[in-house]
């Protein structure tokens, strides 16, 4: 079966997360249903990482094995058509080898957190940023962030139901850029 790599973005507000669950709609479930409607057979869709409930993605990588060969633009367009009106978009599709695995072939992941540092409430960024109405000490934040760089055991930060094999992770970079009242942390 030919394997295809998907690059997708989604608004996770109304999803229980990436992984298919019984307690509500998931991104994985929506993609698998779209693939079923496209090819007429169940297709498992695996991601590089499983986002939690309410988490958005701008470049999530996933893969799926289709029962036959298709043009990559056809796959992208068909999945997007079957995903409507869900807030999920397949941005790119690439044919890859059967050895490629979205999760295990990933060499790094990038996360972005947005802080809006002002007294007025969020409107457009609601659900996409953390509003902090008090002044922030950016120098103290930068100094504290240096302690997170490198290899550390993040057990204390894991959810009880976390299924990752290890809580030991390596943080290569941590950058904080302020533009007006927005602080972007990557």
Q: Where do the protein language model's features map onto the residues?
A:
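Structured-RNA-binding interfaces characteristic of tRNA pseudouridine synthases
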Residues: 1-186
